Amino acid sequence: MKLSTRVTGLLNVKYPIIQAGMAGSTTPELVATVSNAGGLGTIGAGYFSSDRLEQEITYLQELTDLPYAVNLFVPSDKLYIPEKVEHMNAWLKPYRRAFNIEEPVINMTEKQQFKDAIDLVIEKGVPAVSFTFGIPEQTVIEKLKERHIKLIGTATSVEEAIANESAGMDMVIAQGSEAGGHRGAFSETASQLTPLIGTMSLVPQMVDQINIPVVAAGGIMDGRGLVASMVLGAEGVQMGTAFLTSDESGASQLYKHAISQSKETDTVVTNVITGKPARGIENEFIHKMNEYDDEIPDYPIQNQLTNALRKEAANKGNAQWTHLWSGQSPRLVQHMSAWALIENVVKQANEIMNR
């Protein structure tokens, strides 16, 4: 078994290791370090304005001339329903008051934001783009392919993987249920729930059904996870939580400490924080929101309704009222540079393969 795969060839990287596009937690330093170490660094641009994204890309290009990716959230067709928003605002009012937070103004601008981001990655010559929450329109895919930009889809089921391949993605992330942060799902099960299929189950089933390369994600923290994924047929891995505690991560010390102190049983998948299912460390905010007796507003509305509250809690060092996205392998986190992390992953993988 070799670490040279179709993924390394398509992305023009040394190692089949992708740093997940963790919106809100990536920095140009993290992305550049991963790319310079031989992996594929990713700008988590899901929440960025076009101005902010341009700044990030421009600075990143000063730090590396190696391939990197930009991760974008595919906009949804969810509607703004005033009654839902009013009810949620009433529920959040006492908690906002406790943190001295004003009621936010909701901006339904994600479609324009996505369009601007696509135009920008083309203009700036970004080597690769990964997508979360769905598949972009065919015109967008064709426009990116004309510029030879590599496209990375996200799937939480075989059905979603097939859809990604049919749409023209160059490779697909098999996001297992162990993964931290938002579920990349864009389909629902018969019970109208997001698919929650473990990485070990998802990867080989996906590999058997599609021809484009599969990249395993979810709970992968070290060389053991890389080798195991490749044995299952994956041609690379995407790691998120492992990079959250790295020196270059944009995660706060509060956040890093919470992950370091948590156990594999401490995370839950919930939609109460942003309106989309996401895996994070269970805390008081989630407990309180679970008492809400109405339907949670959809993403991006719920995300905007709770955003300022979560930010202020984090600023005040209160881990109980912010989001703490994390995968199910927190006992395996390490505190080191992203470069050292990649070196360790590769070294351990090679040792295992050479036994």
From Swiss-Prot:
It comes from the Bacteria. The keyword Nucleotide-binding applies. Binds 1 FMN per subunit. Its EC number is 1.13.12.-. It holds the Pfam family NMO. Keywords: Detoxification, Flavoprotein, FMN, Monooxygenase, Nucleotide-binding, Oxidoreductase. Its cofactor is FMN. The keyword Acyltransferase does not apply. It catalyses: 3 propionate 3-nitronate + 3 O2 + H2O = 3 3-oxopropanoate + 2 nitrate + nitrite + H2O2 + 3 H(+). Belongs to the nitronate monooxygenase family. NMO class I subfamily. Nitronate monooxygenase that uses molecular oxygen to catalyze the oxidative denitrification of alkyl nitronates. Acts on propionate 3-nitronate (P3N), the presumed physiological substrate. Probably functions in the detoxification of P3N, a metabolic poison produced by plants and fungi as a defense mechanism. PANTHER family: NITRONATE MONOOXYGENASE-RELATED. This is Probable nitronate monooxygenase. It comes from Staphylococcus saprophyticus subsp. saprophyticus (strain ATCC 15305 / DSM 20229 / NCIMB 8711 / NCTC 7292 / S-41). The lineage of its organism: Bacteria, Bacillati, Bacillota, Bacilli, Bacillales.
